């Protein structure tokens, strides 16, 4: 958790164009290692290879969509004319990274459900700690390697495989 807080001091300052670039590289990295990911999923989750490949393809898409959304984290302009004398006042709301995120995932989609936690966290500029299912941690480790190679901050994605009882302090 301390490492994630330290990484947050960096990730919170990463501009949206850079987060977009990292997410695109993650998408490309997963696609380039499609068979490696599919074999890992098939072996650790017991899925047929075709289903595992479909899951990898979905994760590629998830990171691609997140790369596009990283550009669209807008703020809002809110009128403050609720009281007399405030007719010409407005508030500007800016969306900013909040801090480390914990992603706890089940075993049935060991890559795609992790991707659905990691991609939005990166898009928003937050570090993430992933606690994968004890039965299926390998694809999370493979993904963490791709994320690091894509240029995300060291410590910005961590994988902590633990028993459920040991994960309670994270919650």
Would you name each region that the model predicts?
Residues 75-171:
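Rossmann-like NAD(P) dinucleotide-binding subdomain of oxidoreductase/dehydrogenase enzymes
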Residues 1-74:
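Glycine-rich loop-to-alpha-helix module at the N-terminal edge of alpha/beta enzyme cores
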């Amino acid at each position: 958790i301390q490492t994630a807080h330290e990484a947050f001091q960096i990730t919170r300052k990463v501009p949206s164009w850079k987060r977009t670039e990292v997410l695109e590289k993650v998408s490309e990295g997963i696609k380039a290692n499609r068979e490696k990911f599919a074999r890992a999923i098939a072996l650790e989750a017991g899925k047929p290879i075709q289903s595992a490949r479909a899951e990898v393809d979905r994760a590629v898409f998830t990171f691609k969509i997140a790369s596009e959304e990283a550009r669209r984290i807008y703020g809002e302009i809110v009128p403050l004319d609720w009281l007399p004398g405030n007719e010409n006042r407005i508030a500007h709301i800016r969306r900013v990274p909040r801090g480390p995120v914990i992603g706890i995932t089940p075993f049935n989609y060991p890559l795609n459900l992790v991707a659905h936690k990691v991609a939005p966290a990166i898009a928003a500029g937050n570090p993430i700690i992933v606690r994968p299912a004890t039965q299926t941690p390998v694809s999370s480790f493979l993904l963490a390697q791709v994320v690091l190679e894509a240029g995300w901050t060291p410590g910005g994605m961590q994988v902590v495989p633990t028993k459920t009882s040991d994960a309670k302090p994270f919650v």
